[in-house]
């Protein structure tokens, strides 16, 4: 990056106007001034008395390289000649009380490996990208009418080396990306990778928003990781936290000794739930810092999306003893989304929001917040409560499985089976399932079948694909040894087949956000806890029939209404022996019966497996073919003979 300095108009703009390339002004930039090579340092510290740059190059002497205050509103700058890359540094800030505090650079592009906390001078330009084809293809697609299966991942605990050390960005590219491609995931969502001091914050309590964490390597190493993802056709989404930040002494908290990036009002400054500080989203300098940061990750790291963390915490704050909406946050989120989509109209901006705030995914010009996706937390909570209930009692909470369809089209939803649900004593998805060993696996297969056939894009946390038995342990890697056990191998095979089926079946994603894409066949069979529905694609004849049985009872010749009087094939049955099931499948082509049922034109009689999902597809034949004419005649003959009987 080339520094933009000595431009008073541009510096003043940072305080009063939109300045979305503030990373070009602030931070440490290699520069040539008056023919001399060195580094230009620029920082915002509005209430500092004095400021200097310190590091190994001056033996951390705050009196040697004092900075100049270049705007009345508190921008400080200094050019230091003959400093090179990889030098470490901090700002020594003299507060209004005369105390000297050391702070890392808010705009630093790299930092020391924890537990050290200094910033590192590094020019991140120069990586040669190879993902033009990825972006060319992405522009031709509508994000809403494509399959989306997201693999949520914590970089430090997916897999570790035998000695317990972490894989680097480049090593993870070799290990993880082929694995994801083999499992047919379309995107990876990585828990925050901004620099953060505490491993167990999972990255959600950051100190260096412009610095990809040095735990796993350098900025160019992470660029390589993203580049490789794109080569394999996998999009990269980052968790991003613009609502609050950690209070470690070297970070943003009380940056110049007074509230700078956080609110001055003590009522709303502190985030008491997480022990962090809330960003002052009404302050122009803070908005420019955050929105520039989003665009920085897009520009320099070719990121495809953000999952914006804790939106509910931003939208509402507790003021004067009661919860109120935060209009600063509302305005900020709208401005953020407008800026992002002006840069890339196909970018993924996902709100992690558990509230009923209206129009989260509506455009700002329609009064919305401007996101294009929202996590469906209500679906997740209802479905998991239903699955955790003993099967014989599920009929009493039947509505938990049907309620989501009443609001499924109010937003562009992603269905999340996320990290939050498999940690802190909540158990793994597999262990949430009631019953014996076999029943747990059967019900998890059933849950995944329902998950992939319900309207909405999909997100699954790592380990769920093979039935991780223990809940997530963030200091350890996944239990890869489970592949030694037959049922886990079967689960893994089932998951790969299910997600492959999802990706090649347009009815399961083409009309995710249209009422036309879903129709109940039977939503009211609570006594048997069986649900059946139709998923539809753009083409009228592109349909799938889904039947889910949430009890252990097997039903023979169970009647299911179907929209067309024709033949149907069972294209997936979670009870197949190959998946660890009992083998109650429908091998033969199913002949529909012309008698209407479930308000449908016809019906089929099928075997309903225990704790199973069955997916049927109409048999398609070329119009006017002899084979088709013969099948129609056979169907008519069967219908006639039944009427005669």
Swiss-Prot record:
Biased composition range(s): Basic and acidic residues: 626-635
GO MF terms, alphabetically ordered: 1,4-alpha-glucan branching enzyme activity; cation binding; hydrolase activity, hydrolyzing O-glycosyl compounds
Keywords linked to the UniProt accession: Carbohydrate metabolism, Glycogen biosynthesis, Glycogen metabolism, Glycosyltransferase, Transferase
Listed Pfam families: Alpha-amylase (PF00128), Alpha-amylase_C (PF02806), CBM_48 (PF02922)
Active site per database record: 309 (nucleophile), 352 (proton donor)
Signal sequence region: none
InterPro entries: A-amylase/branching_C, Branching_enzy, GlgB, GlgB_N_E_set_prok, Glyco_hydro_13_cat_dom, Glyco_hydro_13_N, Glyco_hydro_b, Glycoside_hydrolase_SF
Residue ranges, annotated region (Disordered): 621-645
Biological processes, Gene Ontology terms: glycogen biosynthetic process
Biological pathway: Glycan biosynthesis; glycogen biosynthesis
GO CC aspect terms: cytosol
EC numbers for this chain: 2.4.1.18
Catalysis: reaction(s): Transfers a segment of a (1->4)-alpha-D-glucan chain to a primary hydroxy group in a similar glucan chain
Protein family per UniProt: Belongs to the glycosyl hydrolase 13 family. GlgB subfamily.
Functional description taken from the UniProt entry: Catalyzes the formation of the alpha-1,6-glucosidic linkages in glycogen by scission of a 1,4-alpha-linked oligosaccharide from growing alpha-1,4-glucan chains and the subsequent attachment of the oligosaccharide to the alpha-1,6 position.
NCBIfam families, sorted: branching_enzym (TIGR01515), PRK05402.1 (NF003811), PRK12313.1 (NF008967)
Assembly with partners or alone: Monomer.
The protein's name: 1,4-alpha-glucan branching enzyme GlgB
Organism, as annotated: Bacillus cytotoxicus (strain DSM 22905 / CIP 110041 / 391-98 / NVH 391-98)
């Amino acid at each position: 990056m080339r520094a933009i300095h000595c431009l008073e108009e541009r510096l003043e703009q940072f305080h009063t106007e939109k300045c979305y390339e503030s990373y070009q002004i602030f931070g440490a930039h290699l520069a040539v001034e008056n023919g001399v090579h060195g580094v230009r340092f620029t920082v915002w510290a509005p209430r500092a008395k004095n400021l200097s740059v310190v590091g190994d190059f001056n033996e951390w002497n705050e009196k040697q390289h004092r900075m100049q205050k270049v705007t009345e509103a508190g921008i400080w700058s200094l050019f230091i000649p003959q400093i090179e890359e990889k030098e470490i540094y901090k700002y020594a800030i003299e507060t209004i009380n005369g105390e000297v505090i050391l702070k890392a650079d808010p705009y630093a592009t790299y930092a020391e490996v924890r537990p050290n906390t200094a910033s590192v001078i590094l020019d991140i330009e120069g990586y040669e990208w190879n993902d033009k084809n990825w972006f060319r293809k992405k522009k031709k697609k509508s994000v809403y009418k494509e399959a989306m299966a997201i693999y949520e991942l914590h970089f430090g605990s997916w897999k570790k080396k035998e000695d317990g050390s972490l894989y680097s960005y480049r090593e993870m590219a070799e290990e993880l990306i082929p694995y994801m491609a083999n499992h047919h995931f379309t995107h990876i969502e990585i828990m925050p990778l901004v620099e953060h001091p505490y491993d167990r914050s999972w990255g959600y309590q950051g100190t260096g928003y412009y610095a990809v964490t040095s735990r796993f390597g350098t900025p160019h190493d992470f660029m390589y990781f993203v580049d490789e993802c794109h080569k394999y056709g996998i999009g990269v989404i980052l968790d991003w936290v613009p609502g609050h930040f950690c209070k470690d002494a070297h970070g943003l908290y009380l940056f110049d000794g007074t509230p700078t990036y956080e609110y001055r009002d003590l009522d709303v400054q502190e985030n008491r739930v997480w022990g962090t500080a809330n960003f002052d989203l009404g302050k122009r300098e803070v908005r420019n810092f955050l929105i520039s940061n989003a665009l920085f990750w897009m520009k320099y790291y070719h990121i495809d999306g953000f999952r914006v963390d804790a939106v509910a915490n931003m939208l509402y704050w507790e003021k004067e003893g009661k919860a109120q909406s935060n209009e600063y946050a509302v305005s900020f989120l709208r401005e953020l989304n407008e800026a992002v989509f002006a840069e890339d109209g196909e970018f993924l901006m996902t709100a992690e929001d558990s509230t009923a705030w209206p129009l989260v995914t509506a455009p700002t010009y329609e009064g919305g917040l401007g996101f294009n996706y929202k996590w469906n937390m209500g679906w997740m909570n209802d479905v998991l409560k239903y699955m955790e209930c003993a099967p014989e009692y599920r009929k009493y909470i039947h509505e938990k499985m049907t309620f989501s369809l009443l609001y499924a089209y109010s937003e562009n939803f992603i269905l999340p089976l996320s990290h939050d649900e498999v940690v802190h004593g909540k158990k793994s998805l597999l262990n949430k399932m009631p019953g014996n060993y076999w029943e747990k696996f059967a019900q998890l297969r059933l849950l995944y079948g329902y998950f992939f056939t319900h309207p909405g894009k999909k997100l699954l946390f790592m380990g769920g694909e093979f039935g991780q038995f223990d809940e997530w342990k963030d200091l350890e890697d996944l239990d890869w040894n489970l592949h030694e056990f037959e049922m886990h191998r079967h689960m893994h095979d089932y998951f790969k087949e299910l997600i492959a089926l999802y990706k090649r079946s347009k009815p399961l994603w083409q009309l995710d956000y249209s009422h036309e894409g879903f129709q109940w066949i039977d939503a009211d069979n609570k006594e048997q806890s069986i649900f059946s529905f139709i998923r539809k694609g753009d083409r009228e004849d592109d349909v799938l029939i889904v039947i889910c049985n949430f009890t252990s009872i097997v039903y023979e010749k169970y009647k299911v209404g179907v929209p067309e009087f024709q033949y149907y094939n069972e294209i997936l049955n979670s009870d197949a022996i190959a998946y660890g099931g009992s083998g109650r499948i429908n091998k033969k082509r199913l002949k529909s019966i012309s008698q209407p049922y479930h308000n449908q034109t016809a019906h089929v009689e099928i075997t309903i497996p225990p704790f199973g999902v069955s997916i049927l597809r109409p048999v398609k034949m070329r119009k006017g073919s002899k084979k088709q004419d013969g099948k129609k005649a056979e169907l008519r003959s069967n219908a006639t003979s039944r009427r005669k009987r």
